[in-house]
Each structure stands twice: as C-alpha cells, then as structure tokens.
Amino acid sequence: MIRNSMKSHTELLSWNLLQKEADRVRLNSDSLTCVVPDSNNYESSKQINCIEYDYSRQRVNRTIIDLLIDLANEVKLQEKIDNLINGKKINISENRPALHTALRDLGNKSIMIDGLDIMSAVINTREKIKVISNQIREKKWLGHSGLPITDIVNIGIGGSDLGPRVCINALSNYISKEFNYHFISDVDPASFNDVIAKINPQTTLFIVSSKSFTTKETLLNARKAFALYEDTASIDQHFIAVTAHPERAYQMGIKTVLPIWDWVGGRFSFCSAVNLITAIAIGYEQFVELLAGAHDIDTHVQFTDFKNNIPVLMALIGIWNNNFLNIHYDLIGYNFKEYFVPYVQQLDMESNGKSIDVNGRMVDYATGPIVWGGLGNQAQHSYFQLLCQGTHRCVGDFITLKTNDEHEINSMCHYKMKVLSEGIQTIENPYGYIPGNMPMNHLILSDCSPYTLGALVALYEHKIFEQSVIWNINPFDQPGIESAKSAHREITLSSES
C-alpha cells in the first residue's frame, strides 16, 4: 500500500464545514422543514431540454449547496471534467484516457491521444454502423442461404449486454417490429437454449461484443452459436464482432468486425458499436438522436456553472447523503420499462465501489453506495414497506415520464414520494407511524425517446464520474473484477493439468 503525506479529503476545509452542517441537521432530524430555514430564493429544481431535476425533497439548503460547491472547487472538479472530455489520461492505473464522450461528439473538433486525432476512427465506425443497420433494415443483408435477417442476437456480458438491453426495452415504441431481438449473456445452458429455440439460424445475425475478445462467457456462447452452422464459410453473413482486438475475432472466423478502443470502458460503451443492435432496431437516424442527447449532457456538464449543473448537483447531493448523513443505500425507482436499474448498478458500483484512492491509499470515508431498485409500481408490493418503516435509511431517485402525467402510474409515484418524504403520524394507530424524511430526487423526463434516453444515461455517467473526483478514486478500472477473472483462469488451468 502506497502511503504519502498528501491530505485526505476529510481534511479539506469545506469537508469539515459540511460535517458541522450535518451535525446540525441530525439535531433537527424530525422534520425536513428544520433543514431548510434559509429557503428564501432557494431554487430546488433545474431543467435541461428533456430532463427536469427536482431536489426539493432532499435534506439540503442553500448553505449546504454552497458548501458542496466549495468542496467541488477545492478538489478542482471543473479541471477534472475538462480533462475527461478533452482526452487527458485520467484513468491513471491503466495510463489512458476515458473518452466515451468522444463517441457521441457530433461536431468537427479534433480530440488527440498520443498525437493522433481519434475522431476520424470514431466517424468511420459510425459510418459502418449506418451502412450495416441500413442494409439489414432494407433486407439487403442476406444470410448464407440468401434469406434476409429476421432475428438479431446480442452476445455479450456487462456493458456489452446491459446498455443494448436498456435501449431495446425502453425504446419499444421506436424499434422496428420486423425483427426479433434477443440477448445471451449467461453461461447457464438454459439461457442459450431458450434463445436458440426461438430463431432460425439461416435468418439470424449474431453480434458478439467483447472489448478484449477473451471474455470467457461471451466466447463460450459465441462458439455454441458457431456450431449452429455447417462450416466456417456459412457464418460470414451471420456474425459481427465488436472488439478492441479485431485480430482475435478474425482468428475465430468472424470477418465483419467493428472497433471499440481501449480508451472506452465497457460500462461506458453505451454510445459505441457495442450498441449496434439498437441502431438496427430504431434506425441510424434515431441512433444519432440517442448520441445527440448524450452529447448535449456532455456540453451541459462542461460549460454550466455548478449551481445550475444537473449532474454536478446530483453528484454533490449524493456525496452529502452518503458521506455526511451516512445513508449508503441508493434506490432508483422508475415508471418506464425494465433494465435501467441493473444498468446503473453496474455503472455506479463497478466504477465507484473502491476503497483505494488514486494515490494508492486506503480511504477513510465512504465511497460508492449500494444501488438497487426497480419498477415503481412493483415497489408497492415488494420493498415499499421497508422504505416506509424499515431500519435501513435510503435515498431515492424517482424517475417519471411527463407523458404519463394523466396516468395512474404517475399519481402512484407522487403518492409514494409524499409518504416517504412527509411521513404519516396517526395517534389512533401507532403501528401505522411512518417517520418520513427520506431524501429523494425526482427526475421528470419529457418522453422516452432516443434523445431523452441518451441524455439520461449520460447524466448518470457524469454524476458517477464527478463523485469519483470528490472521493479521489479511479472510476475507470475494475481490479476486483480482474482479480476474479485471474483466479478463475488459475483454477481452470489447475483442473486441466
């Protein structure tokens, strides 16, 4: 373990002032109104294009927000945001940039890595995505037997699975109904067999996504898919690989390969060729809308002052809850489609589930929270009881669609937020007492379009990055995952010898 004389973030002036504010809040914990006495002219909602952010139910006031912004300034958050987007090598353990933002940059600026402009490769790959998706949608991409494609199967795991799943599920009103979409990520044979039972191999396209092209689960399922065809000559039109190591895909017999690069983390690959299945499903023009939504959040986070910066405010209020109010369970409840929570779980916990800071020291403060949740209407019959009267304190992000304002689903969400924030006190029934005071954000999306989904995903990406800066950890590596892979390889080699 590296030890040096650099200050811990808990020694910063703003951190200690925030600790004093937290002590005062705890003394007045019986009522949210006790937390916000200086609320005159205090704005508790912000908006950018398709997303409104309401944090009026958070246990913060103007003083606390100002101190959180002071903390952001003390750790040079603006400089770190600029470094992220401009391609500095901020992934220090792997000595490379984390340039997922470049994937959705639709402008003409150059972004340099080691003297090379990467944008030409990004634009070239986008053009390949356009050509492939158009050919398949126009029935011009034919299988080995001359039949057009009817089924697309995405084989991948982690970021190569969850991002595409979110899109196909959330954008159901936009996807072409002329195709069937399937996902294989598990090595459980039943998972593979369930998909294969639904398809005709002669009209199926498999997209095999693996950044390293050594991911055991993905390659195992890819080889099983290969076995559906008579010989290697017949697989050419049925397999596309997405990888940072095209030579490994060629070696395996896949001729059509789209690149991803080592400067894109798997869990941040939402806007890359990993999401080819979505470009096919919604069409390339709508796929560009998804990129545009994400890019507009990139611009917002880089050029908006912190008091009006939605990802920054979400990050800072999350720090307040996690590090000063000691609430380490982060619920995400939403009223549109599935898979968003699993996606954010991986994005957040794999990025910020760290206890070693960028200087190689054990931290002396809490880092990434436990992220959980699910569909809001199902919460009523699962974990809502725990939120109301349980002993574990939680914070929540509740996400609703403005287009559902006239529907029961939104009124139920508003009722839940009211009960959880205000509580219920009844003298007649002491068993019905609900303390309330659960801190929560409310994100109101204008719709569930590709543009809005791209913006929502980018919002969480930036929130997570900005929290990593406050915690002084690297969100772009995953040594725990890598060590588990190494241990598995050693066990496999030992059993084979």
Swiss-Prot record:
One of its GO terms (biological process) is gluconeogenesis. Disulfide bonds: none annotated. InterPro entries: G6P_Isomerase, Phosphoglucose_isomerase_CS, SIS_dom_sf, SIS_PGI_1, SIS_PGI_2. Signal peptide: none annotated. Transmembrane segments: none annotated. It holds the Pfam family PGI. Its EC number is 5.3.1.9. It is found in: Cytoplasm. The keyword rRNA processing does not apply. PROSITE patterns: P_GLUCOSE_ISOMERASE_1 (PS00765), P_GLUCOSE_ISOMERASE_2 (PS00174), P_GLUCOSE_ISOMERASE_3 (PS51463). Coiled coil: none annotated. The keyword Cytoplasm applies. It catalyses: alpha-D-glucose 6-phosphate = beta-D-fructose 6-phosphate. GO terms for cellular component: cytosol. Catalyzes the reversible isomerization of glucose-6-phosphate to fructose-6-phosphate. PANTHER family: GLUCOSE-6-PHOSPHATE ISOMERASE (PTHR11469:SF1). Belongs to the GPI family. This is Glucose-6-phosphate isomerase. It comes from Legionella pneumophila.
